[in-house]
C-alpha cells in the first residue's frame, strides 16, 4: 500500500491548519482569503481524509445547486486524485455523489436554494456530521446559513464520529457584508476557528499567476489588496486606523484607576438598539478607553437607570441624543439620573465628531468588556456617492455605540478646537 506524505500535498500554512482540524477543538473552521490561496483545494482534501477516517456522511453546499457540479464536485474529484486514492472512491453523477468504497459512506451535494431538500436528508447508517459551504458570501444573510446548520446538528453522534463544518469564501469588498462582520470580528465564539490565507503562502502557484498578481498590484493597489490579499476594504479608506482592539488589553487594575470618565447615550426604538457607553479619556496620551456598555433592543428607561445606578455611574455626566428630550427628562425627573443632558447638535456635528475620533492617537477597546463597541468600530465604513467613491461621513447603520461615543466626548471636541456647529 502506497503511503502519501501530506507534507508534500499541503502548503506549510495549511498543514498547520490541518493539525488544528485533527485536534477536534472546534466545530466550525472558516477559511477566508484572496485568490490563489488554495483554501478550497485543502478543504476538499481534508474532507476526503475525514471521510476515510470516520463513518459519516459529508454534505457539500453552494448557494445555488446548478453551480455545484462544475465547482465543489470537480474540486473533490481533483482532491481524490491529488491524494492518490482514486481506486478507493466511486464517482456518481446522477445524483452527484462520491462514495468511499471500503465503508460505503458518501459525500452528497445540495444547493442552499432548496433548504427543504437539506432538511429531508436521511442517512441512518452514516450520520450527516460533516458540512462544507463553499462561497459562503453568496448567502444573503447569516440566518440562511443558520437554518442549514440546524438541519445538520441533530442527534448525538456514535463513538468515533464528530460534527465538523467547513466554510470558505473570498471576503466581499463591503465591510458591512454579514460574513465580514461575523468573521472579521475580534469576538469569535469558542467553537469557531478562522483562518485567513493569501497566494503569498502558496508555493505551488505558477509563475504566470504571480506575475499577474504583481501586475495588478502595480496598476491598482486597492484591487490587488481586495482580490489577492482578501482584504475587506469597504470604500477603500479605513475610517479608524487608530483602533487597538484586543482581548484583555484593558485590565481591571486600569479600570479601577480610570478617572476621566465620559458617558454617552443613544436611545433606541423599533429595530434600533439603545446604546449606553462609558469611556476613559487620557488627554496626555490622546487616547480613549472603552470601559463598559449597555446595548440591547427594547430597553426601558427604568432598566437604563437601574444599570447606571447598579454600576455607580450616576456621578459622571451622561450626554444623550437630544432628539429625545422627553426621554432625557424622564430619566432625570422620574428615575433620578440627574447628571444627564442632551447633545448640542449642529449641521456638521456628525462629521466633526467622527473626525475628532479619527484624530485620536488610539481608540482602545477590549472586546471581552465591550463587544458591541468593538464590533461597530471594526465594521463601520464610509458612505459612498453614486460613483462608489467614499464621502467623509460614516454609514448610518450599525453605528449606535459610535453615535453614543460622539455624544460622550462632545465637550472635548469643542475644547479641542472642533465646533459641533461647524
UniProtKB/Swiss-Prot annotation:
The keyword Methyltransferase does not apply. It is an enzyme of class 3 (hydrolase). Changing residue 321 to N: Complete loss of endonuclease activity. Keywords: ATP-binding, Endonuclease, Hydrolase, Magnesium, Manganese, Metal-binding, Nuclease, Nucleotide-binding, Viral genome packaging, Viral release from host cell. This is Terminase, large subunit. Residues 232-422 are annotated as: Nuclease activity and binding to the portal protein. One of its GO terms (cellular component) is viral terminase, large subunit. The N-terminus contains an ATPase domain and the C-terminus contains an endonuclease domain. Changing residue 403 to N: Complete loss of endonuclease activity. Changing residue 400 to A: Decreased endonuclease activity. The terminase large subunit acts as an ATP driven molecular motor necessary for viral DNA translocation into empty capsids and as an endonuclease that cuts the viral genome to initiate and to end a packaging reaction. The terminase lies at a unique vertex of the procapsid and is composed of two subunits, a small terminase subunit involved in viral DNA recognition (packaging sequence), and a large terminase subunit possessing endonucleolytic and ATPase activities. Both terminase subunits heterooligomerize and are docked on the portal protein to form the packaging machine. The active site is at residue 135. The gene is 2.
